[in-house]
Amino acid sequence: MKITTVATTPFSGQKPGTSGLRKKVKVFSQPGYLENFVQSIFDNLEGQQGKTLVLGGDGRYFNDVAIQIILRMAAAAGFGRVLVGCKGILSTPAASAVIRKQGAFGGIILSASHNPGGPDDDFGIKYNLGNGGPANENFTDAVFKRTQEISAYRLVESADIDLGRLGESRIGEMLVCVIDPVADYAELLESLFDFDQIAKLLARPDFRMRFDAMHAVNGPYAHAILEGRLGAPVGTVVNGTPLPDFGGGHPDPNPVYAADLVSALADPHSGLSFGAASDGDGDRNMIVGKGFIVSPSDSIAVIAANYKLIPAYAKGLAGVARSMPTSCALDRVAAELGISCYETPTGWKYFGSLLDAGKVTLCGEESAGTGSNHVREKDGLWAVSYTHLTLPTNREV
């Protein structure tokens, strides 16, 4: 295996934020820009030789190009195997699930979350650790320091990998496995929730739902889980095909950018009982009822209050956590349940140490993110599935 070393010079401003490095596509597409940042990640790893890396993104513009570059660089960095989502697709919570289930060393997720996509819009990259969660500040600070002094990056010359076909191929000595991006994640959700109960709800003639995937990454997941495994009518999922520019929309599940969904639920003639939407990389969510929207602060409180309805959590919650700007509704629920409620800075990565220590089971933040200890990222479809089982109509099934 021949490794090519390419001389480079630092770019300014490659400092990761709370969710990795995000810049305009035109910035990332500069020769060496992505390569410098990826090499700076790899230069701060120890023990990755022969190990597994998980790779994928939300399908936005530049996703496919970036994946081919990262695969070649991963081979040069000594990884033994890369699991990459088919067509380059892998939602953020699904990536976390795959990392954890497959015992991967870590993962690279390509997304700018709820920011718009396209040649003139945004792209992003972040590294997740072996626990499936975002890298901590010590690691990201070290990556930034490396970007300021980098002088070369390394790759293995190779033809592009066919990302549209499931199967195995090689770059040098490294095995590349193109995987079904939905399988491990769907299996995990089914282990947490009573899918038979949800399916009964979705089959009721007096209950209709709509899920707006916003032409983002959760489209294939929602089609496979809601319409496939749970039997919701075809057409329940709208805007379900991931597009590089999200169909010209802004993949942020809020009343402004998901106005069509909100309007449909407010229309008494629509026949809809329940609505939901998720963002670019599938980790945020919005829950909509008939003429009302569930605020993120209330969503995590409702989820915690109804934990006994969910098989995976019915034996009790270790504790709960919320970000500082999130309202105190969760605190009230925790007090009633007699469990601890922790407050963290903004950024999902701050929940990671609490989850890993077994101190909390459920987490929520002000920016439409909710999740639990099943992965180390917030999780849009998890929140939708959980909410299904808390609906009064479902308890009567």
Where in this protein do the model-derived segments appear?
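Proline/glycine-rich low-complexity loops and linkers
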Residues: K87, N138-A183, G289-H374, D379-L381
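Conserved phosphate/anionic-ligand binding catalytic regions in large, soluble enzymes, centered on
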Residues: K15-V25, V217, G364-E366, L381-W382
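Short glycine-rich or small-residue beta-strand-to-loop segments that form or flank ligand, phosphate
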Residues: K24, T52-D58, S111, N128, ...
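Conserved small/polar residues in nucleotide/adenosyl-binding loops
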Residues: T387-T393
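Gly/Ser/Thr-enriched, mixed-charge loops and adjacent short helices
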Residues: K2-F11, G32, P119-H269
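Glycine-rich phosphate/diphosphate-binding loops that line cofactor/substrate pockets in enzymes
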Residues: V38-L53, D196-R204
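N-terminal small/polar loop signature for handling phosphorylated ligands or for N-terminal nucleophile
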Residues: V54, D58-D121, A224-I287
